[in-house]
Each structure stands twice: as structure tokens, then as C-alpha cells.
Swiss-Prot record:
Quaternary data: The RNAP catalytic core consists of 2 alpha, 1 beta, 1 beta' and 1 omega subunit. When a sigma factor is associated with the core the holoenzyme is formed, which can initiate transcription.
GO biological process entries: DNA-templated transcription
Protein name: DNA-directed RNA polymerase subunit omega
EC number of the protein: 2.7.7.6
TM region(s), chain numbering: none
Amino acid sequence: MARITAEDCNKIIPDRFRLVVLATRYAKLLNYKVETNQIKKEKRDKPPVIALRRIAAGKVSVAQLEQDLINSLRTRTMIEPLVNQDESEAVEEKFEYLSEVYIGEDYSDLDDQIFIDENGEDYETDK
């Protein structure tokens, strides 16, 4: 068989970037000897060449490769909530004494303040 090229695989996976990612993943699986019996038959070829040949021949399930790739990239299977309701109630209880203080997103109260730089000199904030 002649050298395999990316054009041979374009019929199966039209996007070259996707082809590279999936072929790399499959080559890594081959390199870790997931399919040891089949590698021995094609021993003279390296795993990337074997992966590209199998993708071009349609012997590899692209959907299964994609799912395997996604699963390998996941760090956690379930995302835990950042704040539980009990914790948020506890935080509210800690700041009950600040009920008179209004905290908003408006920073206009900073306009009247005088800021001092490192040398102890005043500078204006209107610049």
C-alpha cells in the first residue's frame, strides 16, 4: 500500500484539525498496545500510520474515538455546586451588624476622596 495521506482520510473526517486530534488519540491507544494482536500484523508501520490507514479504511468508529477523547480530557465527571444554601445563610448571619451599610456597584463615592501617591503627594482622580 502506498503512503497514506490526509487526503485519503478526508472522506471519513473532512476537517483536518479534527482528523489530526482523532488520529493522534488512536495512535496513542495503539502505542499503549490496546490492540496488541493487530499491531503485530502491521509491525513494520508506526502507530500514526496504522491509525491513519484504519481511519481511511473506515475500520475505526469516529464517534467512539471522539467520545473516548472527550472522556480522557475530563477532569471530573460531576461538577459540585460552589456554594451550598447552608453556607450562604451562614455568611448572611455573619454580616447582620452591617445592615445600615449600603454596598453597591456605583463607585461615585470615590470621586470626593483624596488619593496620595508613594511620595506623599496628592493627585487628582479626574485625569
